[in-house]
């Protein structure tokens, strides 16, 4: 986090509950302080980022190799109460997260409020042929969306 603290996010209870665990100051082990989140919702692949003082988590459902809908949640603090907002993806195959799964959200260097959502597109029959999908996150009026784009460049962040 921007305060020097580190956290581990993991699913437990047969992948039904996501835990957020504060690590010790040396980042080597759990501190013993944790929260249970999305209880019974079976979420995985958390990609967490901070925007205007709020924490956002992009995540996927636990459906094995089968694609599913993404969800974004927001919290005022990383160990606080997370509120699910819904699917941020729009466009073709948005209900399947563009046949991909969240993996990371990359802040764009030199740009304020600019982020790239990174996804894994697993090919279960040939893992070596799996791909990545990178898409810009749009932020308008506090609403985050990830629209499908066949192609794009960094100019999208200048608008």
What are these model-predicted stretches?
Residues 1-159:
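Carbohydrate-active catalytic/glycan-binding domains of CAZyme proteins
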């Amino acid at each position: 986090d921007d305060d020097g603290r580190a956290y581990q996010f993991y699913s437990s209870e047969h992948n039904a509950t996501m835990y957020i665990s504060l690590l010790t100051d040396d980042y080597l082990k759990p501190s013993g302080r944790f929260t249970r989140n999305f209880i019974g919702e079976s979420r995985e692949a958390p990609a967490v980022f901070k925007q205007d003082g709020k924490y956002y988590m992009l995540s996927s459902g636990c459906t094995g190799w089968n694609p599913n809908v993404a969800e974004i949640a927001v919290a005022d603090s990383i160990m606080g109460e997370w509120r699910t907002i819904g699917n941020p993806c729009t466009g073709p195959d948005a209900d399947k997260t563009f046949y991909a799964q969240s993996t990371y959200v990359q802040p764009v260097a030199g740009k304020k409020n600019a982020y790239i959502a990174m996804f894994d597109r697993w090919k279960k029959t040939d893992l070596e042929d799996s791909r990545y999908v990178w898409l810009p996150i749009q932020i308008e009026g506090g609403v985050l969306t990830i629209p499908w784009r066949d192609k794009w460049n960094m100019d999208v962040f200048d608008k």
